[in-house]
Amino acid sequence: ALGYTAEMAIDEAQRCLNCKNPKCVNGCPVNVHIPEFISKVAEGKFDEAFGVITSTNSLPAICGRVCPQENQCEGQCVRGIKGEPVGIGRLERFVADYHNAHGHQGGAPTVPESNGHKVAVVGSGPAGLTCAGDLARKGYDVTVFEALHQVGGVLVYGIPEFRLPKAIVAKEVARLEHFGVKIMKDTVVGRTITVDELMEEQGFEAVFIGSGAGLPMVM
């Protein structure tokens, strides 16, 4: 799918009822402020909408494409009771793609000051990248260790190109690097370096292990 044009996005956003108690937010695993970002889209303030989304979601262009919205945010949309729910996922995708295409920075969160703490993230799949983004927003010095030569984990190795283009993943990763996230590829934690070495020799205070379950199990 090609996604929304600006006109289509505004029209779709205007369908939102801006519920007083938005169930869509409760259905979102990362608690994106959905009515707020949609209202910004309806006003044509796409950069501000991007800022709202990325205040809680580090991977909007990815989530807008592959999150199961029908069971999460859109599944809770009141509009869906008597018709089609608001296309929340497609609106999120539009906002992220618009931001990437136009290179705007006005709506993006500013790079926070360092809080002086170091955290290692093992694995650059969706869990690892999300963790890295959330920590970077809070001022942590984050380094992601990826065993393979390409960053993204299942996002690049398990999802076909037509569903999630690798260029989209690369742009999301580049934005995380803009916030100070460092990425070490071809580094197998447990072989190349151990968790103990990360903490005792390299000064990391915590390690998040998001290595995934991508390897087959031999019966």
Predicted regions mapped to residue ranges:
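Cysteine-centered iron-sulfur cluster-binding motifs in ferredoxin-type domains/subunits
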Residues: I10-E43, F50, T54-I88, G128-T130, ...
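Iron-sulfur cluster-binding electron-transfer modules in prokaryotic oxidoreductases
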Residues: A120, T130-D134, V142-V144
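FAD-binding core/adjacent interface of flavoenzyme oxidoreductases
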Residues: F37, A61-R65, Q69-V122, R137-K138, ...
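Conserved Rossmann-like nucleotide-cofactor binding loop
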Residues: A127, Q150, G214
